[in-house]
Amino acid sequence: VKNIAVAGMSCGGLQTLYNCADPRIKTLMICNSGLFNQSNAGSAVGGMPMPPKEKLNEIHSSILYMLGGESDIAYENGMDDFKRINHVPACATNLPVGHGGTYGQPHGGEYAIVALAWLDWQLKGDKKAAKMFKGDKCKLLERKDWTIEKNELFKKLK
């Protein structure tokens, strides 16, 4: 197996980041999640891995943050992670739906559309799927209420 994605939602996003250094991983998807700052780590779920923000330095693959906008309880943690990542291509997408995302909608709603495009691009090299994220006028911005931020390495992707 050569194309492995690791993804998680909420606490699962913390587990994804805990395992980010695995050399088999080709891409990461962090959904409605982000590492706690040391100042708020005490409010984390007991028994969950709680890596420090320095763990982000171990990421070696592309990474997508899919967040639920400012009303998402994980918004600040996820956006803080995104802003700290400058050594691999990273992007942060937001849809103002809160922490529950669109998972309860038929077929996963908008989140599923974006997640599948990411996976098709990152794991299969699908150029059409890449258009969802790449460029100043990426297809994501044509979808209702979505926003996207990209780090400098992401902006340079061909």
Regions found by a protein language model. Give the residues of each.
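Stable alpha-helical elements in mature extracytoplasmic
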Residues: 12-15, 78-81, 111-115
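Divalent metal-coordination and catalytic microenvironments
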Residues: 4, 92, 119
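Solvent-exposed, acidic/flexible segments
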Residues: 21, 56, 108-112
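The feature captures the conserved acid-bearing segment of alpha/beta-hydrolase catalytic domains
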Residues: 26-105
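Sec/Tat-exported extracytoplasmic proteins
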Residues: 23, 32, 122-126
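Gly/Ser-rich "nucleophile elbow"/oxyanion-hole loop immediately N-terminal to the catalytic nucleophile
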Residues: 1-10, 14
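Alpha/beta-hydrolase-fold serine-hydrolase catalytic core, especially in secreted/extracellular enzymes
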Residues: 88, 97-100, 105-158
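Short glycine-enriched nucleophile-adjacent loop
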Residues: 13-23
